[in-house]
Amino acid sequence: MVLWQSDLRVSWRAQWLSLLIHGLVAAVILLMPWPLSYTPLWMVLLSLVVFDCVRSQRRINARQGEIRLLMDGRLRWQGQEWSIVKAPWMIKSGMMLRLRSDGGKRQHLWLAADSMDEAEWRDLRRILLQQETQR
């Protein structure tokens, strides 16, 4: 039985926060007074920041699609069923779910509040908090 479901959208807040953090790190690398002999080092560091920024944006974009919370702490997402391993870590802007598949694969799923409707966000928080108190 489905307790809750939503069609997750891309979280614009998560995208902007990722871009802001990566941009600040890149700015610090560029503005530091590097000696000329350190040019290869700061170029490698800057390349790593850019590649990590791209990877971060791809991961954020992958966090969309239909998601369902089932009975007994199970979650159906991206065509797979996951068990919620621990109580979710919640803040006002999102929650972190620690998941494990039947095959033993583990994953951390960040659900941002702006990736779903406000009513869906409230319902999900309420249901998960109720399940937490019943354990």
UniProtKB/Swiss-Prot annotation:
Top-rank taxon, per record: Bacteria
Region (Not required to inhibit FtsZ or MreB polymerization): 1-96
Keyword presence, Transmembrane helix: yes
Subcellular location, record wording: Cell inner membrane
Principal localisation: membrane
Record's keyword terms, sorted: Cell inner membrane, Cell membrane, Cell shape, Membrane, Transmembrane, Transmembrane helix
Regions that span the bilayer: 12-32, 38-54
Keyword Cell membrane annotated: yes
Ranges per topology, Cytoplasmic: 1-11, 55-135
GO biological process, one term: regulation of cell shape
Residue ranges that the UniProt entry lists as topological domain Periplasmic: 33-37
GO cellular component: plasma membrane
Membrane topology: Multi-pass membrane protein
Function in brief: A probable inner membrane protein. Has been shown not to be a toxin, no effects on growth are seen in LB or minimal medium up to 6 or 21 hours (respectively) after induction of expression. Interacts with cytoskeletal proteins FtsZ and MreB; inhibits FtsZ GTP-dependent polymerization as well as MreB ATP-dependent polymerization. Restores production of prodigiosin antibiotic (Pig) in Serratia strains with deletions of sdhE-ygfX; overexpression of this protein and CptB also restores Pig production to a slightly lesser extent in Serratia.
Subunit structure: Interacts with MreB and FtsZ; interaction with the latter requires FtsZ residues 33-49.
Name of this protein: Inner membrane protein YgfX
Gene expressing this chain: ygfX
